[in-house]
Amino acid sequence: VGFKAGVKDYKLTYYTPNYETKDTDILAAFRVTPQPGVPPEEAGAAVAAESSTGTWTTVWTDGLTSLDRYKGRCYHIEPVPGDENQYIAYVAYPLDLFEEGSVTNMFTSIVGNVFGFKALRALRLEDLRIPAAYAKTFQGPPHGIQVERDKLNKYGRPLLGCTIKPKLGLSAKNYGRAVYECLRGGLDFTKDDENVNSQPFMRWRDRFLFCAEAIYKAQAETGEIKGHYLNATAGTCEEMMKRAVFARELGVPIVMHDYLTGGFTANTSLAEYCRDNGLLLHIHRAMHAVIDRQKNHGIHFRVLAKALRMSGGDHIHAGTVVGKLEGEREITLGFVDLLRDDYIEKDRGRGIYFSQDWVSLPGVLPVASGGIHVWHMPALTEIFGDDSVLQFGGGTLGHPWGNAPGAVANRVALEACVQARNEGRDLAREGNEIIREAGQWSNELSAACAIWKEIKFEFPAMDTL
């Protein structure tokens, strides 16, 4: 057959409603808003084409390869109920399109140029199904939930953290003092804020030293293993690794990375170093809302969460459901399960478009953080369960008596909620009562209860199904 030049509709090649998906295909669910006059089949096919083998015109080199083997296929389209002119387009990608063990390459293909495509008014990647064959090419989290519990020797309850505030402006010595007060009061972890890197008021090496001193002092006093998320994020990968190496030399248990601003390549390198050297890795999702907050354009956070589990991290921030940041309960629980569990069943009610089998890739602890305090503790314990990290920044440091009493209040509240739950009480219904009862035995908790009882951050969530 001679080569036929010219432009032809994408749907002639890339829309294949009869296609049977393979176990090895990467499957994607896109929310597509076509421009007026563009049929949904053409829009879905355009997404499949531009994110795989296609370009805008027929090229003679198409004849040198097997398009049938390598092309992405739009295999199903359904309208979004209640949304005029929006469709969910399902696309299957052959596994050979992707480099093994590279989240970077996977995203460059699937969410690359296609998002600027003229035929589409908007495009959002709602979910990805990672096939077992591809998941097995990733190391994933450096350690995972069980190994972390064993390292820390802490079982049967969520872990407690605190972000040190004010996030910017403290000297290293004062910062270390704040860390020590929180840890000795009963927290498991304290945390560098995401934008604490190495600024003129506090260089990274000084901070690492004073925080390590605080950790060792608090451990000696309490007999518990403590940690501080030392933020290794830096301007270059080499500098980031240098910071991680120094943390390991200090003998601390955990470092931290901003995975979206730092990038997946840097993150995967750091995760591999952490596994080889026994460091836990805490992941902050700074910049995620730029990508995931718009309902009809961007990438849903559940996809960013899956990508992080592949790239590697032991903790990741996952919203609170009850605090000051976005998050709708069922949807949040959907991606919390995707982070922790080995197998997750398809469940459109929770926004999960595909069943996902992680084939024993270690799990990630979800971190609830942002505007939460002791009155939220029963709800958080119920929603997130034991395998989570609950982080109270202002909710610890804002205590009227200072950091250590703030930490005591949180620890008492948590222990009370876990005990009540284990006794069979209903945290959702009796939560306030449980906290009040515990406050009778803890002056620190009752002082915290008095200061925060009226606080609410209640706006309707943007992220609905």
Swiss-Prot record:
Binds 1 Mg(2+) ion per subunit. The modification N6,N6,N6-trimethyllysine is found at residue 4. Keywords: Calvin cycle, Carbon dioxide fixation, Chloroplast, Disulfide bond, Lyase, Magnesium, Metal-binding, Methylation, Monooxygenase, Oxidoreductase, Photorespiration, Photosynthesis, Plastid. The lineage of its organism: Eukaryota, Viridiplantae, Streptophyta, Embryophyta, Tracheophyta. It comes from Epacris sp. The record marks 324 as: Transition state stabilizer. It is found in: Plastid, Chloroplast. This is Ribulose bisphosphate carboxylase large chain. Signal peptide: none annotated.
